[in-house]
Amino acid sequence: YEIKLHGKNGCMAYRKGLQSGVRKQLGFALKDISEHLPGAFIIYRADKEDDELFYANNEFLHMAGYKNVDELFQITKKSFRNLIREDERQQIESSIWEQIDNGNENDYTHFHLRKADGTYLSVLDHGRIVDSQQYGRVFYVLFMDWEEMHIHYGDKLLG
């Protein structure tokens, strides 16, 4: 079972100390994790011209008021930039790409996220750029509701 944690169709010679307890990790399906993780996230194409949205978990849809992923894709035209308030778009996209172009695999930014009803939610965005075999370069992005963070963490955010 240990070899399964490193991908399908693998093999490994037996060696003393292989952990059978690792089997527990195999019981969690990606869908279970993405739908029950206490965090809103999306996945989108990491391309300055074509930032196509691929995925949003239920936590993101709920936080932003979208009924389902189809409504999200329709309203945003499947584009990440259409989630950013228009007057912030250029500055936020520049900030993200400047961080990546400077050799960082993570980016951090704060902006106003477009909700399904057209209102905006102040969010912290923590993105990571990765190479996907299937989609090429993509961003995995976690979102935190800025106001909720201040309510729950208050002064702890300041250090």
Language model features with spans:
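Short loop/turn elements at sensory-signaling interfaces that couple input to output
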Residues: 5-7, 125-154
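Per-ARNT-Sim (PAS) sensory domains and their PAS-associated C-terminal
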Residues: 87, 91, 101-128, 134-138
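PAS-associated C-terminal cap
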Residues: 18-23, 27, 144-159
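PAS/GAF/H-NOX family sensory domains and closely associated sensor/linker modules
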Residues: 69, 78-92, 98-104
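Conserved beta-strand cores of small sensory beta-sandwich domains that regulate signal transduction
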Residues: 12, 42-45, 112
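PAS-family sensory domain signal
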Residues: 29-78
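Cyclic nucleotide signaling catalytic output domains
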Residues: 1-6, 12-25
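Signal-transmission coiled-coil "S-helix" linker that connects upstream sensory/regulatory modules
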Residues: 12, 31, 54, 157-158
